[in-house]
Amino acid sequence: IRLRHAYLNLNWGSSSLLVGQTWNPLYGEVSPQILNLNMGAPFQPFGRAPQVRYRYNAAGIQVTAAALWQSQYLSNGPDGKSNKYIKNSLVPEFYFGVDHKTSNFIVGAGVDVLSLVPRTQATVDGNVYKVSERITTVSGEVHVKYTSPLWHVAAKSVLGSNLTQVSM
């Protein structure tokens, strides 16, 4: 089954809690204006993920924290794309971001941490050995967007590592 968006969002005014599957937070509020689903990959992070996301808004500042898992957009590893690498790690992907918003301007940044265990055993000359391997990557993004009735100007930069789960 391919699930696009299915979530529960509890909104208390200045804060909200989202539980379910929706856009990966790296996708963000600054993305290309498009006519079809060509989202700009491999330059724009694109993917949906099961997640628990908390947002707090105060005085034009929005803080986002999320813990994510992988379902259909997967990390690549020794056995190809699979969700077993994040299952082996027992640690979700984490995201933290801050945005400053006005009626027509957004500027912000975010950090994503992903820790995977690509394999738990290795076979050498017919012998199976237990291995202890972990890869932890930190990725960052900054973005800015200005909109008016006549203009839409946006810029985003991603410095990423091991971001196959968001089509990069």
Which positions does each model-derived feature cover?
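Outer membrane beta-barrel
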Residues: 1-73, 90-91, 95-103, 146-149, ...
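Outer-membrane beta-barrel transmembrane strands
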Residues: 54, 68, 87, 133, ...
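Detector for outer-membrane/organellar transmembrane beta-barrel domains
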Residues: 102-168
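Outer-membrane beta-barrel translocator domains and adjoining extracellular loop/strand segments
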Residues: 29-37, 70-90, 114-132, 165-168
